[in-house]
Structures are given as C-alpha cells and as structure tokens.
C-alpha cells in the first residue's frame, strides 16, 4: 500500500514511518510530498495519507492525536509498549504538549537532527529506525520489571 506524507520528516512522521514498516505494512511504499499534494495523491492512489492537511490521518485528528498516536490507538492498542511510545511522540510533536512526558524533549531534540544528517526522507526512515527500535526495546524492558 502507498503511505503518503509531507517531506522533511522529523518526530511524528519519522515515528509513523517506523510504525508502518515494523507493525502495519512491512511492504509499504512511502511517498514524501509537499503538504498540499498529500491529500490529492492519497485520493488518486487509494493510499493512506498522514500528517498533512485533509489526509486520512491528519497532523492532529478530532481527538487531538497526532498520526502516530491515532494509528496506535486505532490499530495497535493491544501493545502497551506502542501505547507508551504514542504518549512520547504525541508530547514531542504537538505544540504545547512537550511537558506531558519526560522523554518528549529528548525525542524532539534527536528528531530535529534527522534532516541535518540525512540526504532525503527515505534515508531518514532507514537510519532513524534504530532510534525507534531502541525506544521500543527500552520501554518493553522497563515494563517487564
């Protein structure tokens, strides 16, 4: 399936790409466009748009959730590690929520550097997967204690 989002990914979009690849659609085709193109390409291709105006999963949905958190709550709420990750990504990505989780500032700071050390969004997805894999493993380890 095609998953379409805004280019120059950082916090929420990088995390959502990781979520798609690891849990939702390992064969996904990720497409990065300008914000105004996302919804029309979503509609033309039958894909799923996220973190863009009029996308299936907008930057913030009616409940105030970012696309990562919305996808977790809708499709993966049975995984307590992903639920906790959703809290972190939500706090790091949505303006005014940074103090809602102690890990949010760190994730925001790290994610802000993604486009500074990669050549394009596909490289960001590949290289940032380590961050989200490590975050998942750390939360899982902490929850097992």
Regions found by a protein language model. Give the residues of each.
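Extended, well-folded catalytic/binding cores that form a central cleft or groove in large enzyme
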Residues: 1-8, 17-18, 22-145
């Amino acid at each position: 399936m095609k998953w379409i989002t805004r280019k120059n990914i950082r916090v929420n979009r990088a995390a959502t790409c990781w979520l798609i690849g690891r849990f939702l659609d390992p064969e996904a085709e990720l497409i990065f466009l300008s914000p105004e193109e996302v919804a029309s390409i979503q509609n033309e291709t039958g894909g799923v748009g996220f973190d863009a105006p009029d996308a299936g999963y907008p930057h913030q949905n009616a409940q105030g959730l970012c696309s990562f958190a919305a996808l977790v709550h809708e499709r993966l709420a049975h995984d307590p590690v992903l639920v906790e990750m959703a809290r972190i990504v939500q706090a790091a990505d949505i303006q005014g929520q940074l103090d809602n989780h102690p890990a949010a500032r760190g994730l925001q700071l790290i994610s802000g550097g993604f486009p500074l050390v990669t050549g394009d969004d596909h490289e960001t997805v590949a290289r940032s997967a380590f961050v989200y894999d490590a975050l998942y493993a750390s939360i899982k380890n902490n929850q097992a204690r």
